[in-house]
């Protein structure tokens, strides 16, 4: 009887750990760049490209390509979410308001921008912890290497892949994924 109780307890605790580990992209709430709460569950049924961005980086011109990608595919259940972060070389020093003005004025950004967060280190945002840790996303460890690293999330909220910061938003990997090829 003790053996059965032990096995049952072990089984139930394993199930609890697995559900806690892979709670899914859609379970997170984030803050928009203008301070509103946004539930990622609103994106169920859409492919999502998550990208950490910075205004004073050599890769900042990717904003233009990201906007072009968004314009091309936004009517095909695709969305981009930008997360400003100041983790690399202090290249995103501005306030949320300053970042929003910069993106709109210089690149015409209309894809959703979120409030500035940390994408690595001790103060990493919960969403980025999930994006970067296999134990949580169930797929792969993918530490953010620099500004403009991209994560691909499918319609069900499952982690699909990541794309290195220097790769174009129009890389074959991203476009093929969006188009379902």
Sequence positions of predicted segments:
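Bacterial Sec-dependent N-terminal signal peptides
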Residues: 1-23
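N-terminal "domain-start" segment that seeds a small globular fold
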Residues: 18-41, 125-126
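Short, internal strand/loop/helix patches
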Residues: 24-25, 97-146
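Amphipathic alpha-helical repeat scaffolds
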Residues: 32, 52-56
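Conserved helix-turn-beta segment immediately C-terminal to the redox Cys motif
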Residues: 46-47, 56, 60-84, 104-107
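Thiol-based oxidoreductase modules, predominantly thioredoxin-like and allied folds used
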Residues: 77-94, 110-121
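Thiol-/selenol-based redox modules, centered on thioredoxin-like
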Residues: 129, 133-181
């Amino acid at each position: 009887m003790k053996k059965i109780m032990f096995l049952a307890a072990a089984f139930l605790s394993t199930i609890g750990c697995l559900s806690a580990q892979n709670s899914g992209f859609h379970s997170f709430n984030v803050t928009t760049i203008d301070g509103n709460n946004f539930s990622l569950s609103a994106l169920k049924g859409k492919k999502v490209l998550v990208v950490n961005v910075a205004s004073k980086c050599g890769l900042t011109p990717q904003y233009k390509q990201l906007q072009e990608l968004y314009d091309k595919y936004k009517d095909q259940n695709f969305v981009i979410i930008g997360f400003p972060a100041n983790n690399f070389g202090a290249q995103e020093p501005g306030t949320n308001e300053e970042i929003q003005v910069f993106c709109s004025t210089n690149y015409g950004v209309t894809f959703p921008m979120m409030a500035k967060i940390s994408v690595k280190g001790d103060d990493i945002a919960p969403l980025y912890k999930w994006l970067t840790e296999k134990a949580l996303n169930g797929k792969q460890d993918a530490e953010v290497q620099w500004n403009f690293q991209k994560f691909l999330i499918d319609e069900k909220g499952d982690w699909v892949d990541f794309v290195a910061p220097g790769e174009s938003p129009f890389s074959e990997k991203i476009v093929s994924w969006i188009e379902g090829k």
